């Protein structure tokens, strides 16, 4: 089962372009990857403009056969797009007028997380705008009612903490296999 997500970027005009991402959309997976490997405005924009994807790696990559054997290939490092790599239609990026509209429409296909890269208002050492990642989440109460965050929260710290938990569980599983 997938943890679905949306990945968006807020443009200077205030509008948001975004696309769907199917696998490992939780903050310790996709969120951590976004914080670690997707800081460049042009790279993120180019990736989103390729449309909906199965997964995001660390690079946009090249067209590749989705059904081919991927052992020993660069597949794990590349994004895998529905149109470019699988030949599917009607899976381009979407445009929203603002953050509220993005949140309102971001959970229509079973997404659990919606990510947004936006300008922090700060400048980097070269005087260029600094961008960082934010997220909103959809979760269910014990009564089964869906609750969706109404405002974006900073992603980086939460993504790192969740990624550390994932690594700890992996180490525990390795230790259990050694004992067995």
Language-model regions, residue ranges each:
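Short, extreme N-terminal segment that most often corresponds to the first beta-strand
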Residues: 1-26, 30
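An exposed acidic His-Trp-rich patch
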Residues: 31-37
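Low-complexity intrinsically disordered segments
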Residues: 37-180
């Amino acid at each position: 089962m997938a943890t679905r997500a949306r990945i968006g970027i807020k443009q200077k005009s205030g509008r948001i372009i975004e696309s769907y991402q199917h696998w490992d959309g939780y903050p310790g997976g996709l969120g951590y990857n976004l914080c670690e490997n997707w800081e460049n405005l042009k790279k993120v924009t180019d990736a989103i403009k390729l449309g909906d994807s199965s997964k995001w790696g660390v690079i946009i990559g090249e067209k590749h056969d989705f059904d081919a054997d991927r052992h020993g290939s660069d597949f794990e490092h590349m994004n895998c797009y529905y149109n470019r790599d699988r030949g599917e239609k009607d899976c381009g990026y979407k445009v929203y007028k603002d953050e509220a509209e993005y949140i309102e429409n971001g959970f229509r296909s079973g997404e659990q997380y919606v990510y947004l890269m936006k300008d922090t208002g700060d400048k980097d050492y070269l005087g260029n705008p600094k961008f960082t990642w934010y997220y909103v989440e959809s979760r269910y109460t014990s009564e089964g009612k869906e609750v969706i965050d109404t405002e974006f929260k900073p992603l980086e710290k939460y993504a790192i903490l969740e990624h550390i938990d994932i690594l700890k569980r992996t180490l525990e599983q390795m230790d259990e296999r050694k004992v067995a």
